[in-house]
């Protein structure tokens, strides 16, 4: 699917996949894809979770570019819930001048898992002003495109220190708070999710995610708001 989309889109690309200590034959499947795709596979022997995987992927994308002002990293799940069909609109928005573009999740008639519906309903009340002050309408979505120069500026300040420490959707909010001070312009484009074709049960946990959102609000976003008013 990625190959078809990118061929029609007409952009050079490389797929970077993170195999988070999988035990379900993922490595064998990826080996077959490497024969037909420009693909690089990162692996770990011990599971590091969603925030660690996202950070590894973004750091690797930055390490592999010679043109950070031009090149773009698009993050999407490899379990088919996020469709490659949305890559082109995300990239087009970056090429149109944005530094970060978020895929804002839209209803498509296919219900989200109950725990996710609960978390999405509670999160705006839990986050309060933090949710309303976010530069995009869906700060919880992880389906995003980043101009790599923004990540380069992030790593200039963070160095080897991890910039993501919170699990699940909370990590998406945390990452938005990390990159926002370095982005001149942020945008969004509508995307839809397909949890009905997910190959394995979701690891999403609503209560853990909501607790993480509270921590991110205190440690990342409230600090960001204070810096804006200083």
For the regions a protein language model found, what residue spans apply to each?
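Short beta-strand-to-loop acidic/aromatic patch adjacent to the donor-nucleotide binding site
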Residues: 66-81
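A conserved acidic beta->alpha catalytic loop
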Residues: 19-28, 80
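Conserved beta-strand segments of alpha/beta enzyme cores
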Residues: 14, 38-40, 135, 185-187
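Hydrophobic helical membrane-anchoring modules
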Residues: 1-4, 8-12, 32-33, 157-230
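Short beta-strand/loop segment that forms part of the nucleotide-sugar
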Residues: 11-21, 42-44
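Acceptor/aglycone-binding surface of glycosyltransferases and processive sugar-polymer synthases
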Residues: 39-61, 70-72, 84-165, 196-204, ...
């Amino acid at each position: 699917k990625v190959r078809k989309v990118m061929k029609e889109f007409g952009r050079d690309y490389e797929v970077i996949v993170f195999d988070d200590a999988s035990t379900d034959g993922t490595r064998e499947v990826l080996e077959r894809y490497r024969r037909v795709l420009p693909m690089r596979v990162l692996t770990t022997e011990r599971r590091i979770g969603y925030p660690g995987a996202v950070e590894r992927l973004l750091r690797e994308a930055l390490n592999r570019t010679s043109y950070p002002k031009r090149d773009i990293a698009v993050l999407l799940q490899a379990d088919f819930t996020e469709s490659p069909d949305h890559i082109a609109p995300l990239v087009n928005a970056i090429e149109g001048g944005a530094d970060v573009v978020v895929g804002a999740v839209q209803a498509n008639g296919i219900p989200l898992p109950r725990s996710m519906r609960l978390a999405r309903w509670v999160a705006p009340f839990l986050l309060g002003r933090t949710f309303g002050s976010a530069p995009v309408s869906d700060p919880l979505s992880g389906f995003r495109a980043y101009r790599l120069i923004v990540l380069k500026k992030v790593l200039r300040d963070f160095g080897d220190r991890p910039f993501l420490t919170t699990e699940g959707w909370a990590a998406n909010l945390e990452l938005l708070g990390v990159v926002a001070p370095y982005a001149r312009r942020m945008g969004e484009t509508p995307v839809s999710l397909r949890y009905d074709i997910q190959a394995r049960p979701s690891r999403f946990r609503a209560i853990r995610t909501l607790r993480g959102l509270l921590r991110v609000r205190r440690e990342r976003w409230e600090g960001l708001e204070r810096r804006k008013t200083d």
